[in-house]
Amino acid sequence: MSLIEIEHVTFQYPGAAEPSLNDVSLNIEQGDFIAIMGGNGSGKTTLCKLLNGLIPHYYVGDITGAITVDEIKTLESKVTDLSRSVGYVYQDFENQLVRAKVIEDASYSPLNFGYHDYLERGKTALEKVGLIGKDEEYIWELSGGQKHLLALAGAISLEPKILIVDEPVAQLDPQHAKELYDVLKMLNEKENTTIIVIEHHTEFIAEYCKNVVLMSKSKIIWKKSVREGLTRVNELREKDIFPPQITQAAYSLTEKEDSTLPITLNEALEYFESYQAPEHNQIFLQQTVQKIKEKIVDIQNVDFSYKTISRQKKKILNGVNLTINKGDRIALVGNNGAGKSTLMRLMTGIEKPEKGEVLLKEMNTKEFSPEKFADMVTYIYQNPEEMFIDDSIKADIEYFLKARNVKDYAIAVDHIIELFQLREIKDRDGRLLSGGQQRRASLAIGVAMQPLLILLDEPTANLDIGTRKHISKFIQSLKDEAEAVIIATHDMQLVAEWANRIIVMKDGQIIHDGNRETVFSNKALLDQAGLTPPQIMEISRLLGMKLAYSVEDFVKYAENFGEESAYSGNYKEAARVY
């Protein structure tokens, strides 16, 4: 008998026109590490909520079929009966943190189940996820990555046989994402925990998982080994799922869809060995002529701190100097906790610097209220639903223009609705839209304010790859709607394709201000900041080729192999990547 058996399950939420799961069957064995792939709305999260009993015991609806988990028939059991067998880390993991201190939160589940050794169980869980020594810290003092690990510690404190993690890397920087997956790998290999991840990032699936399930339109299309699944390039693309970039590149060069295609970076080094460039001693970077530019924001020697619960100061920004100019398309990058979001809030006037000055069009933000700058700066939140205050998208877009008594605002609203392709959903409540639709609508609301400066916080977080590509096209158009645009993001592909300036932050300081050539060709800088370049860029660097910023770039350089222009002079690296 399999550890998990799902037999012909159909589930439909109340009021929904179509079922979220339609005749779904799936078996998962003990010790598997399996990824569930599919576009937004394909049924991935609904499928996983069957396994811990949240469906149908919390989220009600019409359900048929049978689900057996660790020999427990879930439709006939309680959620508490399944809690010892199934741990779950949700996509919005911060909502799982329910106690003030780290050790209290990690030991909360065993305490609720009456275990006398609940504190020891909590400490053991913290040790497994690498948070030992953080026991007495308050959860709001943790970075985003540490909070995710704490949610994971709480989920494994009951030592479940099955662990489900929804979108493990959606809100994490690359370094913390790898740390989280390394913990999952350890649990799988050392404790035989069955790991189920809902994942859009196929590079992580290739590196860590054993099997993969493809879902589309509420159905399971197939379950296959990772290698067999990720090399089905055409089928995945048809479902708006994108295989690893190196797999796409190899397929484009050979037009052969088989299991010999590389799916990891180490495999790609061997596969593309014949394309490796000769060694060179120098890295050649494009020289640009500096021009005098019009300043929009001038940040001068700024410090910023938050007060902790013990009334001590926690330094967030330290000695930051930065000028934002007209025409800048800036990517603000760095690990969780580097200070990116705080820096953007200072530009809005919502936060005031502890030391130094923030000048917006030569106006000191310390001397004016945030309302003074509302006409000049738009801040689009990481969670787009926070932008919706009315009962329709059109009303939300109109709101600011009406409040400012803008003449002929209806013409501007119509232009924005057309620009962001919102015509069909303009009368719907933004809070009820899909993730991609919400993001488009939030961008439209921001543009409607007609600002000089647009600030976006993680605009592609929590989106599947197909939707991310779609949203990226709309972000490209923002350069025509404002004098400057700044994006705080972990999405290095967006950075590589969109930004004309990249600012790298670490521990509250700016450690580099350059462009994609100066950032992505500098391995020491990438390591220092904990940044992971897009896979296709990394393989081109390791092969000594000119940096490829997209799969198309790599294929073009490879097809022109042998021509001097195909190489940047990057030194050859023979070492394998681990």
Functional labels for PLM-detected ranges:
Residues N52, T348:
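Helix-to-loop junction immediately C-terminal to a conserved catalytic motif
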Residues M37-G39, V333-N335:
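The feature captures the beta-strand-to-loop junction immediately N-terminal to the Walker
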Residues L163-D166, I454-D457:
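Catalytic Walker B motif of ABC-type/P-loop ATPase nucleotide-binding domains
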